[in-house]
Amino acid sequence: MSSFFDYNNKFIQIMNKAADMMITSTMWILLCLTVVCIGPASTAIYHAMAKAVRYERESAFKEFWRSFKQNFWKSLFFGLLLTVFAVSIYFVDITANYDFLFNNAAPDGWALFGLIFKVVVLAILGLYVFPVISRFNMPIPRIFVSSLLLSIRHLLSTVFMLVVLFIAGYATISYPYLVFVLPGAFAFLQTFPMEKIMRAHMTEEDRVEDESVDQWYLDIENKE
């Protein structure tokens, strides 16, 4: 019986990870309800899933709040930027496609293309910007450019993450109670392609530094 409750027991480890996903998902939801904190919360949940759940450094709760505070302003900027972009899509592109989306009318080809294109760009930026902020200390313009370049350079991984994101979104709409676990679960799955992508663009010196328990953020700004 004692071995069943051993921390190294696989079942216990899985349950601990599931609990971390539920806790961080709930924190993410509550913070996103403020709208203003969407960016900082998104950076924090990725950081917590990568550092605490996948790499098992510290606790997910502790790392979530550490990242939330440490990356607040840059994440706030991009969170508000993407929120404004999303609102513009709603009022401009959704309105232009209203009859097609809600009244079964024939679609306007260009209007529909514009809607799909903008939604995909919004999703891609969201997928890359916040993990980059969680990993690298760099100026805001470089975060934006690096996120776009990484999404293009690693197109297959980008497509994979987009598909998983839209599946998660559809599942949440269909089964709303999943909102208490899917944000964390998605962020955890996202760490597998994203960590591989970001580590591929680190120098050998960066990789050595990254192996340290206390070293996590890579200060690109001060190295140049």
Where in the sequence are the language-model features?
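Helix-coil boundary and N-terminal low-complexity module in membrane systems
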Residues: 1-113, 124-128, 132-224
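Cyclin-like alpha-helical protein-protein interaction core
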Residues: 115-118
